[in-house]
Amino acid sequence: MASSEETPRSLAGKVALVTGAGRGIGKGIAVELAKRGASVVVNYNSAEKPAQEVVDEIAKTGSRAVAIKADITKVPEVSRLFQEALQHFGHLDIVVSNSGTEVFKPEEEVTEEDYDRVFNLNTRAQFFIAQHAYVHLRNGGRIVLMSSVAANMSGIPNHALYAGSKAAVEGFTRSFAVDAGHRKITVNAIAPGGVKTDMYDANAWHYVPNGKPGMPMEEIDKGLAAFCPLGRVAVPQDIGRVVAFLAHPDSEWVNGQVILLTGGSVT
């Protein structure tokens, strides 16, 4: 990871909403935006205590934050989330749709419930988050959606459900970028590879050659790091820093793009 330095508060005066921000990648994004001066809405669904801990961590950076509970798979909840965010901070400049879930299951065993659970959160929710962002963002705002390297990977078994749910988001990104352009709102997606979170801990062994359940985490990290020219796996801060760039005015000419965040990994 790059060395730690005092971060310029280049997003001072901006307000960001990050879904699924109580842990993992979402937490990393929320904290990096806050370090740069943004006020942050920390959305969560069930993990109230971790979300409040993120708010407390943000306060230590000198930025403001509020935790708002909302189940973003339900459109009325999405609407309420945006209304409460606006009531608290007055405006929105940046919306990051981060929430997601992952399933590995043989295609013949996937149930309707599996399909709906994955697509409701990974795909449907992201559409309506982006829709509400378009309606409520100030002109010149930023929308960042969450895809995955899995959307374009081949050779990973039992992965169609997750890969398909993320591939759809890439289509949303390109289309929304066209529709939002007249308001100078940019829309991009990020597509991370493995990032050290609780989801990584549960599923990363699937991506390791000859991986198996119960593999020691050190072996998993070593196996995945071997694919990366930088010799390591990602941490949430890596993803947050890229989102912070996309949120910055300097990123205006980056629009309608899906940005792979793999450290150059080739798998």
Curated annotation (Swiss-Prot):
Q: Which domain of life is it from?
A: Eukaryota
Active-site residues (renumbered): S147, S148, Y162, K166
Q: Is Oxidoreductase there in the keyword field? A: yes
Q: Which organism is it from?
A: Metarhizium majus (strain ARSEF 297)
For this protein, the record's SMART domains field holds: PKS_KR (SM00822)
What protein name applies here? Hydroxynaphthalene reductase-like protein Arp2
Does the keyword section mention Ribonucleoprotein? no
Main role? Hydroxynaphthalene reductase-like protein; part of the Pks2 gene cluster that mediates the formation of infectious structures (appressoria), enabling these fungi to kill insects faster. The product of the Pks2 gene cluster is different from the one of Pks1 and has still not been identified.
- What's this protein's family per the entry? Belongs to the short-chain dehydrogenases/reductases (SDR) family.
Pfam families noted in UniProt: adh_short_C2
